[in-house]
Amino acid sequence: MDKLQRDGKEDTSRQRRFLYPLLFQEDFYTIAYDHCSNRSSSFEPMGNSSSNDRFSFLTVKRSISRIRQQNGSIVPFVNCDQNKLVGHNKSFYSELVLGGLTAVSEVPFSIRSKHSLEGMNEWASFRSINSIFPLMEDKIPHSNFILDIRIPHLTHPEILVRTFRRWIQDAPFLHSLRSVLHEHRNLIISSNLDQLILIASKKNTRLSLFLWNYYAYECESLLVPLWKRFSHSRSLPYESFIERTPFYRKIEHIVIFYHKYLKKSLWFLKDPSIHYVKYRERSIIALRGTYLLVKKWRYHLTNFWQCHFHLWLQPYRIYIDELSNNCFSFLGYLLSVKMKTSVVRIKMLDDSFITDLITKEFDPIAPTTLLIGSLVKEKFCDISGHPFSRLAWTGLTDDDILDRFDRIWRNIFHYHSGSSKKDGLYRMKYILRLPCAKTLACKHKSAIRAVRERFGSELFTKSFPKERESIFLSFSKTRSQRERIWYSDIIQRNPFVNS
C-alpha cells in the first residue's frame, strides 16, 4: 500500500488504469481473508468454522492459477462447480474473491482520501455525533424550511459501474466489477441501511458497505460547488440586526437611489442561508425563503441526480417541513423552532416604552413515545409500560444485573441530555427500574416489594459518575430546567434510537 501511495503521488493516472493486475496478487487476498476472519469472529462462534476454511498461500496460488486458466475472468471462478473445488466449499472461494475485489477497489479511494486529509488533524475533534446539534442550534432558527432527503438504497449495478468510471479507467477491472455486481445483486439492493449492514455481516464482505458509502459520497460531492456559489454572495450577520424587515426596505431604497442617480455598481444584499447536514442515509438542508423557492430546490435536486447519476429519485423521498408549524425527527430527537417572546424596555432621550421582542429558539425534544417503543422492541416492557423480567440475565450476579440496567439508562440520558424537556427521560428511568426489580425478584424467587426493601435506593445509583453528577448539579443550580447540555464524547448513535 505504501508503494502504491508513492506511485500515486508521482502519477495519479497509474492508480486508475492498472488495477486489474492487482487481482492476481496474493497479498490482497491475504488482506481480504484477514477482514473476513475478523468480521466472522464477531458474528459467529468459533465452533461453527470448518477446518476446510483455513487459509493458506497454496490455496490462493491455486485460486489465482484457476482464474488465469479461465481467461482472466473472475465470475466463472465464482460460479464454478463445487465439485471442482477440492478441499474447500464454494462460499469460501466466493467470499475470498469478493474480499480481494473489495481490497483492490479501495486502493485508489484510500489514497485519494489520505491526500485530501493531510494536515487536517483537527477533524478528529469533530467525531462526536452531538457536534451536529450545536451547529443546527445556531443555523436552523434562521431558516424557514427543511428539506429532509432520504438517500435511496435500490441501486442498479450498472449505475455503480458508471459512477466508478469517474475515478477508475481500467476497463478490465470495471468489466470484472460489473460481472460480480450483477451476480451478487443482493449485496447492493436492500430496503434500508440497517438491512444492508445486516447483509454485509452475514455475507462476511465489506463490498456492500463500501459501494453504498462511495455512492452516497458521489451523490453529495457534486453539490458542494453549488453551496460555494451561494457562500460567495455577501450576507450580513444575524446578530447585527434584531428587526431585519425594515432594514431590507432601507437597503432596497438605497440601492435604487444610488443606481438611478450615482450610476455605480453596488453589492446587492443576498441572504441564501443554506445549511447542509448528513448522517447515514439522511440529509438535511435548511433553507431560508418562501415555499415556492423550496419547491424549486426540490425540483432541481431531483433533476440533478437524474441527469448525473441516472437516479430516478421519487419526489416523496424529499420531504418539505415548515419549521414554524411542524417538527422533524433526526438522530433520535424531535427538532423544531419555537417563537420566544421577551419583554424589552426601550429608553430614548425623553421617553421610554415597553415592547415585545419575538425571537426564534431551537427546541430539541427527546421523543418519549419512541423511546418506550424501543424498550418494547427489546422486550423490557409492553406498550402500556408493564415490565417484563429478563430471564436470560437471572444467571448473572446482582451487581451485573444492576450494572446492565444502569448502563442502559446512563446511555439514554447521556445521549438525550440536550433535550429541552427532561420529564420524559426521568419517566424512562422509572420504567427501567421495574424490569430491573422484576428480574432480581425472579432470580431470588421473591416478590418485587422484597427486592425494593433489600436494595432500597441502590437501584440505579451508578447512573452518574461522581464528577459528572457534580457538573450536572452545578448546572441545575445555576441554570433553569430547560438548559441543554451537549456531551461531545458521543461518537455513535444510541442503540435505542430508531430515527
Swiss-Prot record:
Its main location: plastid. It is found in: Plastid, Chloroplast. GO terms for molecular function: RNA binding. The keyword Heme does not apply. GO terms for biological process: mRNA processing; RNA splicing; tRNA processing. GO terms for cellular component: chloroplast. It comes from the Eukaryota. Keywords: Chloroplast, mRNA processing, Plastid, RNA-binding, tRNA processing. InterPro entries: Domain_X, Maturase_MatK, Maturase_MatK_N. Usually encoded in the trnK tRNA gene intron. Probably assists in splicing its own and other chloroplast group II introns. PANTHER family: MATURASE K. Belongs to the intron maturase 2 family. MatK subfamily. This is Maturase K. It comes from Macrozamia communis (Burrawang palm).
